[in-house]
Swiss-Prot record:
Gene encoding the protein: hisA
Reaction(s) catalysed by this chain's protein: 1-(5-phospho-beta-D-ribosyl)-5-[(5-phospho-beta-D-ribosylamino)methylideneamino]imidazole-4-carboxamide = 5-[(5-phospho-1-deoxy-D-ribulos-1-ylimino)methylamino]-1-(5-phospho-beta-D-ribosyl)imidazole-4-carboxamide
PANTHER family with a match to the protein in the record: 1-(5-PHOSPHORIBOSYL)-5-[(5-PHOSPHORIBOSYLAMINO)METHYLIDENEAMINO] IMIDAZOLE-4-CARBOXAMIDE ISOMERASE (PTHR43090:SF2)
MF-aspect GO terms: 1-(5-phosphoribosyl)-5-[(5-phosphoribosylamino)methylideneamino]imidazole-4-carboxamide isomerase activity
Name of the protein described by the UniProt record: 1-(5-phosphoribosyl)-5-[(5-phosphoribosylamino)methylideneamino] imidazole-4-carboxamide isomerase
Pathway: Amino-acid biosynthesis; L-histidine biosynthesis; L-histidine from 5-phospho-alpha-D-ribose 1-diphosphate: step 4/9
Length: 239
């Protein structure tokens, strides 16, 4: 299982939110590129980026910070937040992102996901953010009646590289991941599923790994708070 350290970008800074609330942002640094380089130096295989302003605005907002990160690191990076059309997808992939994450648009325009996955094989992921099993969009501000598992299954034949499943109520709360829901989603589809939201300790990571169904896990606040030791986590996952 791959550990994806998270860099959430708000106003050019590295922050973490509590359950997706922009007003509940904790600033962890003003040099996201240096943070990405530190994750790479520690041995991370990937870096997970989120343009928080972009998720709410529906267009890229923290482009300068993302480009600075891409210029600093050699490991692959994936980005979500505000990516809602083919032009933006193509632009980011040309700029050096390994993978784009489509969230809101996966609900509102699933045909775009299929088109992008065909055009850029292996480089398009779907972000499914859910509260009590129901998908939320537009930076989690809008709740839908779409069930997370149904949305995941609808992309089974689309060629998407991964599904990033976030349990909103666990995100940034240090409350532990929703292992049962994530495992159930991962077993419902053949697409690799990456868990996000609530990873707060090494035990959480190992519990996700031990399901045998989950391909990766994203962690942010726990790494910044020191609750999860990155070196120890990487060693444990490779053991």
């Amino acid at each position: 299982m791959i550990l994806y350290p998270a860099i959430d970008l708000k106003d050019g800074q590295c922050v973490r939110l509590l359950r997706g609330e922009m007003e509940a942002a904790t600033v962890f640094g003003d040099d996201p590129a240096a943070q990405a380089a530190a994750f790479e130096a520690a041995g991370c295989e990937w870096v997970h980026l989120v343009d928080l302003n972009g998720a709410f605005a529906g267009r890229p907002v923290n482009a300068a910070a993302v480009e600075a990160i891409l210029a600093r690191i050699a490991v692959p990076a994936q980005l979500g937040g505000g990516i809602r059309d083919m032009a933006t997808i193509a632009l980011w992939l040309e700029k050096g992102l390994a993978r784009v994450i489509l969230g809101t648009v996966a609900v509102e325009n699933p045909g775009l996901v299929r088109e992008a996955a065909r055009a850029f094989p292996g480089r398009v992921a779907v972000g499914i953010d859910a509260r009590k099993g129901r998908v939320a969009t537009k930076g989690w501000a809008t709740e839908t009646d779409v069930m997370a598992t149904d949305l995941a299954r609808s992309f089974e034949d689309a060629g998407v590289a991964a599904i990033i499943y976030t349990d909103i109520d666990r995100d940034g709360a240090m409350a532990g991941p929703n292992i049962e829901a994530t495992d159930a989603l991962a077993r419902a589809v053949s697409i690799p599923v990456i868990a996000s939201g609530g990873v707060s300790s090494l035990a959480d990571l190992l519990a996700l790994r031990d399901t045998g169904s989950i391909a990766g896990a994203i962690s942010g606040r726990a790494l910044y708070d020191g609750a999860l030791d990155l070196t120890q986590a990487l060693q444990a996952l490779r053991a």
